[in-house]
Amino acid sequence: MRLAVNIDHIATLRNARNEHNPDPVEAALLAEKSGAVGIVCHLREDRRHIRDHDLAALRKAVTTKLDLEMAMTDEMGAIAVATMPELITLVPEKREELTTEGGFAIERHFNRLVDFLEPIKGAGIEISLFIEAEQRAIDLAEKAGADLVELHTGAYALKTGEEQAIELKKIRQAAVYAKSLGLRVVAGHGLNYENIAPFRDIEEIEEVSIGHALIARAAFVGIPAAVREMLDIIN
């Protein structure tokens, strides 16, 4: 299983003082050198952490894979085509939320989604949709032309015991189904050093995206050690 590192909260820390450090690009390079196969950043409409100049700098610096998380807006579509990340991941976005709270409402926005994705796919950028682990959402993702889906693991992360086991089963079944349709499968949201291990046994999930937990750990041990510790668990 591969690891992609979300570096948004390096920018959160920097923005707390409106200064230049810590630098998200430096964090991204350290993560890459330590074994991450991709760097994830979410350019939110309110620019609360990653900002436009960060995205431009990351595009120049990242040599593995840059995954731009973004809302389905005309502004973000234009930014994606101008920036040319290897991958974009469409996520729902609410200004009042602390973090992404659920999967993209693909059925509600399907017609708009197909039109929105056309120029991005035409530019050669891969498409991922952040969705709930549900068959209907997977069917629509495939129909819309997604290359891969990121299964939302937030409910799993919030539960314990038997309830968590039920959520894990849903994720496993969704991963198997998505793979059967020819979609690549990744997972993310709320995953950490304590709850990630069971995902090693879901061979259909090729990659996990981890941000907050890893950056929090890095505050104590540094980014290289935090990345290596996570890789030791997932592999």
UniProtKB/Swiss-Prot annotation:
It is an enzyme of class 2 (transferase). It catalyses: 3-amino-2-oxopropyl phosphate + 1-deoxy-D-xylulose 5-phosphate = pyridoxine 5'-phosphate + phosphate + 2 H2O + H(+). Keywords: Cytoplasm, Pyridoxine biosynthesis, Transferase. The keyword Ribosomal protein does not apply. The active site is at H42, E69, H189. 3-amino-2-oxopropyl phosphate binds at N6, R17, G190, G211, H212. It is found in: Cytoplasm. Its main location: cytoplasm. Pathway: Cofactor biosynthesis; pyridoxine 5'-phosphate biosynthesis; pyridoxine 5'-phosphate from D-erythrose 4-phosphate: step 5/5. Catalyzes the complicated ring closure reaction between the two acyclic compounds 1-deoxy-D-xylulose-5-phosphate (DXP) and 3-amino-2-oxopropyl phosphate (1-amino-acetone-3-phosphate or AAP) to form pyridoxine 5'-phosphate (PNP) and inorganic phosphate. NCBIfam families: pdxJ, PRK05265.1-3, PRK05265.1-5. This is Pyridoxine 5'-phosphate synthase. It comes from Chlorobium phaeovibrioides (strain DSM 265 / 1930) (Prosthecochloris vibrioformis (strain DSM 265)).
